[in-house]
Amino acid sequence: MFKLKDATMIYDMDKEDKVYAMREINLTLPDKGLIGIIGPSGSGKSTLMYTMSTLKNLTSGEIYYNDILLGKLSDAKRQELRRKEFGFVFQRHYLVPYMSALENVMLAADGSRKSCEEKAKKLLLDIGLKQKEIGKKPGKLSGGQRQRVAIARAMMNDPKVLFADEPTASLDHDNAYLVMDRMKEYAKERLVIVITHDVSIIKNADVMVEIWDGDIAKITDRRDESFGGTK
């Protein structure tokens, strides 16, 4: 579970006109489900993801993950937390150019090569790649295909939290919906946090958090169980 208390991020602290990427955000997220963080460019939604995942530090306020105060962790402990608990899908794919799609996914693998290869193939097929594309290198794949490889790689080690920043940006609508359906299924036992400006692709989210100008404008909860979020 994540809990944010007065979480604030300010850029250009040394300037007279400071930029508030996040303004005293208070938010509680559960330990599983599909969460959509929605807002226009510059609204602060990506900054929210980066601070929750320990990739950036807050200016003030607190973020807890399973009762651990993230701001108190050393750099080494943060790296360990990201490696063991978190998975990431970024807007840039960061695939190894001389490795095949399958090999790129297996980079994140723990376990025997045979079992990991079978799992990696299944993930790639489930996310929409064709059998003939699995052995291709990134340079031979389209932007959308590379994006799906990155998503499969992020899922490879079954992270407890999957952070996805605009994961369908390179996909057409049909493939975007396929990927989001897969993420919805994946979120039954894990927490999946999707950052997007496109409300249509996150319509099946359990919870939608709308961010405007660094603040929470609205929270929509489609689940029966309790969920907390306050400004």
Which positions does each model-derived feature cover?
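Conserved catalytic motifs of ABC-family nucleotide-binding domains
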Residues: 158
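Conserved ABC ATPase signature
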Residues: 137-141, 145-147
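Catalytic Walker B motif of ABC-type/P-loop ATPase nucleotide-binding domains
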Residues: 162-165
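Helix-to-loop junction immediately C-terminal to a conserved catalytic motif
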Residues: 53
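Conserved ABC transporter NBD signature motif
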Residues: 61-69
